[in-house]
Structure formats: C-alpha cells, structure tokens
Amino acid sequence: MGHEAKHPIIIGITGNIGSGKSTVAALLRSWGYPVLDLDALAARARENKEEELKRLFPEAVVGGRLDRRALARLVFSDPERLKALEAVVHPEVRRLLMEELSRLEAPLVFLEIPLLFEKGWEGRLHGTLLVAAPLEERVRRVMARSGLSREEVLARERAQMPEEEKRKRATWVLENTGSLEDLERALKAVLAELTGGAKGGRG
C-alpha cells in the first residue's frame, strides 16, 4: 500500500509471434506479480462500447451482436475506419487500465502488449521487456500449437515490426532460445534489477 502504490512502475512485455511472451507473463503471475493483458482490456472496451460500435459499423453486426472478425476485416483494410474504431476503443482501454491499476495497488505491474512498439506504447511505460527468439524457431512453435501454415505465420510476422528493430528499442531483451529454466533465470535477473534484488521470483 502506501504512497508508492499510487504510482506503480509499469513494465510492458512484448515479442513477435511465437516468441514466448505468454510464457513470461505466466511465470510472472506464478511468482505473484500482477500482469495485465492489453488484448483482454481491449476486448472489454469493445464490449462496453458495443452499442456505439454497432452504430459506426453496421456491416459488422451479425445476429444483433458485433462480430469481432467482421469488424477486424472492415477496419484493417481501411485506415480511416481503423482510426474511427480506435477513437472509440482507446480511451475506454485507458480508463479500464487506470481502474485496474488503482484496484491492484501494487508497486510493480506488468502489461502484456503484443503491438507495444507498433502502437507507440513505450512512451507511457517505465520500461519494456522484449521476449526474443530466432524466426525459424518462432515459426515452428506457432505452427505446432495453432495449425497455421508456414506462409500464414510469416504473413503475421510481416505485419509486425521486425524483431531486430524491437531489440534496439527495448529496455531488456529476454532470449527465449533455451530451456524454461534458462528463461526463468534471465527473467529473475531482470526482476532483481527492477526490485533492487528484493524479489527476483520465488525459489
């Protein structure tokens, strides 16, 4: 609690498709650190603003409800409509985020943001943690878990900022190329730096 909880240190977790950012988020949660998922907050924001979005995007309404896939198809081929969507959803995401932060009252909070650098989030965070792995390894992981073809995975990769560029921008880079134990060790080193060695994970 105390005054420091009012202004938590917020660290963004990101990584390109198949990097293992969800594994890092799960490790942090298991060690007792709060991790917020920006995609989940965005889904809640869309739900909260559904009536407004239905008026703006009537073509994306299926059976009286806003169809997320139809909405995605509409906006990602039209920058103006994407801007209109973001104008409604982004302020609500920020409101929900502030609500969550005040509810948590934690001195250190992690925020999982898939498109952290692409969407310019780094200016709103105290630091950024990039989970990185070689492209071929990431492609293999995604194909194994999702059933997507190699071409589909590569198309998603091309839609993101190159990992090399993210490496230059990130505060910390976690190399996720070895075992889970290696990843845990690297993550604990970052935590020790963040907390002054006070709580670099348990065990």
From Swiss-Prot:
Residues 10-203 form the DPCK domain. InterPro entries: Depp_CoAkinase (IPR001977), P-loop_NTPase (IPR027417). This is Dephospho-CoA kinase. It holds the Pfam family CoaE. The gene is coaE. The keyword Nucleotide-binding applies. ATP binds at residues 16-23, 145, 176. Pathway: Cofactor biosynthesis; coenzyme A biosynthesis; CoA from (R)-pantothenate: step 5/5. Its main location: cytoplasm. GO terms for molecular function: ATP binding; dephospho-CoA kinase activity. Keywords: ATP-binding, Coenzyme A biosynthesis, Cytoplasm, Kinase, Nucleotide-binding, Transferase. It catalyses: 3'-dephospho-CoA + ATP = ADP + CoA + H(+). CDD domains: DPCK (cd02022). Gene3D superfamilies: P-loop containing nucleotide triphosphate hydrolases. One of its GO terms (cellular component) is cytoplasm. GO terms for biological process: coenzyme A biosynthetic process. Its EC number is 2.7.1.24. Belongs to the CoaE family. It is found in: Cytoplasm. It comes from the Bacteria. Catalyzes the phosphorylation of the 3'-hydroxyl group of dephosphocoenzyme A to form coenzyme A.
